[in-house]
Swiss-Prot record:
Top-level taxonomic group: Eukaryota
Cellular component per GO, a single term: membrane
InterPro entries, alphabetized: SMIM7
Name by which UniProt lists this protein: Small integral membrane protein 7
Gene that this sequence comes from: Smim7
Organism of this sequence: Mus musculus (Mouse)
Cytoplasmic side: 75
Bilayer-crossing regions: 54-74
UniProt keyword annotations, A-Z: Membrane, Signal, Transmembrane, Transmembrane helix
Span of the signal peptide: 1-17
Amino acid sequence: MIGDILLFGTLLMNAGAVLNFKLKKKDTQGFGEESKEPSTGDNIREFLLSLRYFRIFIALWNVFMMLCMIVLFGS
């Protein structure tokens, strides 16, 4: 059960890190505009952009997960 959860999290993190969409930050229009709460879409976009910076960490996590799957969860 815990192996399935770790595998699911790893695959989800990999999918987010390798997305190749042109995600752009939302531009502000000027000084007169009041800052609004970021929408859910804006939060998701920011999260995916931040995942791209952690590709090396994600690659090391993948190697660690492969070793765990062989050593701990192998039958």
